[in-house]
Swiss-Prot record:
Signal peptide: none annotated. The gene is pstB. One of its GO terms (biological process) is phosphate ion transmembrane transport. NCBIfam families: 3a0107s01c2. Residues 3-241 form the ABC transporter domain. Its main location: membrane. Part of the ABC transporter complex PstSACB involved in phosphate import. Responsible for energy coupling to the transport system. InterPro entries: AAA+_ATPase, ABC_transporter-like_ATP-bd, ABC_transporter-like_CS, P-loop_NTPase, PstB-like. It is found in: Cell inner membrane. This is Phosphate import ATP-binding protein PstB. CDD domains: ABC_PstB_phosphate_transporter (cd03260). The complex is composed of two ATP-binding proteins (PstB), two transmembrane proteins (PstC and PstA) and a solute-binding protein (PstS). Its EC number is 7.3.2.1. It comes from Campylobacter jejuni (strain RM1221). GO terms for cellular component: plasma membrane.
Amino acid sequence: MIAKTTNLNLFYGKKQALFDINMQIEQNKITALIGASGCGKSTFLRCFNRMNDKIAKIDGLVEIEGKDVKNQDVVALRKNVGMVFQQPNVFVKSIYENISYAPKLHGMIKNKDEEEALVVDCLQKVGLFEEVKDKLKQNALALSGGQQQRLCIARALAIKPKLLLLDEPTSALDPISSGVIEELLKELSHNLSMIMVTHNMQQGKRVADYTAFFHLGELIEFGESKEFFENPKQEKTKAYLSGAFG
């Protein structure tokens, strides 16, 4: 287990958005969060790196490796908890600098050789190096959408996170680019724990080891993906998976 929540409640003003969420996130596995828009998936995801702190009141416990996130320095926390967003958000810098910027900021690089090796390694991990090796000094905005999203994943990997959060990482991409990202995530999960929000149930079924279904801020069902999709226990889950609501 890499992380867990215990009796997690979250309020936007007087409106409660999450209700007593208890969940364990397993080490080196992909956990998918599914449910209709506004059900609390992304809100829950952002509790792990404290992105809700300024806009919400949070009760309960969120732990990563047994440590309460609210007692951690937020910069140190976000080094250990990477995030990839729905829209690719590359820095307006070169491809090379997109990878090297954060490790240098965190003092992780001792010399130029280390820096270059890290950039190559991260780009290779996301299958991008061969595509960009001759244009590392080019502005990252010149890449295609799918390439930009892989660069964002490589950038997140550069600071060696223990947990990677993905908020609908393929929803803005074409089917071919989405497939490339899905295969990449499955490969990365051998050495990295991930939580992924997705509106694509088939994607969750293809990629995730565990799946959680949220409805109106409540965790309705959570379990291993094969059992979750083939033999759901809760009536609301059955209805959602069959398209009866959501």
